[in-house]
Amino acid sequence: MRFGETDAAGVLHFQQLLRWCHEAYEESLERFGLEPATLFPTPGQQLNLLLPITHCSADFLAPLICGDPLAIALTPQWLDPTAFEVAYSFSSAGRPVARGLTRHQCIAAADRRRAPLPEGVQRWLQASVQT
């Protein structure tokens, strides 16, 4: 953990946890072989399907200070044909320090209605269940 990620009390600033959750999610998708540009909008590109986060939560179990090592494990779970959530476990030196959760809803860009998850995300979720 770096100094810029702490608050005035010298412990983890709360918003950093959710940033790390999203970074771990993006990295997991990339390691699975899904290109970010196929899932996340970029300038000048219109996607047919969008995956907004509809819920997030964070629980802080122990303080994290500058210099603490940090490991993140994530567990995706399929909720229904149009939604999934990802649970995140944070540990430092083998002890649990935080947990997070993001819930994602697939919608069609054209009308903002629920839509089936993209095939790549479905494969990622299926592979996550099997491991």
UniProtKB/Swiss-Prot annotation:
Keyword Protease in annotation: no
Pfam families the UniProt entry points to: 4HBT_2
Residue numbers annotated as active site: 7
Pathway annotation from the record: Cofactor biosynthesis; phylloquinone biosynthesis; Quinol/quinone metabolism; 1,4-dihydroxy-2-naphthoate biosynthesis; 1,4-dihydroxy-2-naphthoate from chorismate: step 7/7
Catalytic activity: 1,4-dihydroxy-2-naphthoyl-CoA + H2O = 1,4-dihydroxy-2-naphthoate + CoA + H(+)
EC number, UniProt record: 3.1.2.28
GO BP term, pick one: phylloquinone biosynthetic process
InterPro entries according to UniProt: DHNA_CoA_hydrolase (IPR022829), HotDog_dom_sf (IPR029069)
Keywords per UniProt: Hydrolase
Domain of life: Bacteria
Protein family: Belongs to the 4-hydroxybenzoyl-CoA thioesterase family. DHNA-CoA hydrolase subfamily.
Main function: Catalyzes the hydrolysis of 1,4-dihydroxy-2-naphthoyl-CoA (DHNA-CoA) to 1,4-dihydroxy-2-naphthoate (DHNA), a reaction involved in phylloquinone (vitamin K1) biosynthesis.
Name under which the protein is recorded: 1,4-dihydroxy-2-naphthoyl-CoA hydrolase
Native species: Synechococcus sp. (strain RCC307)
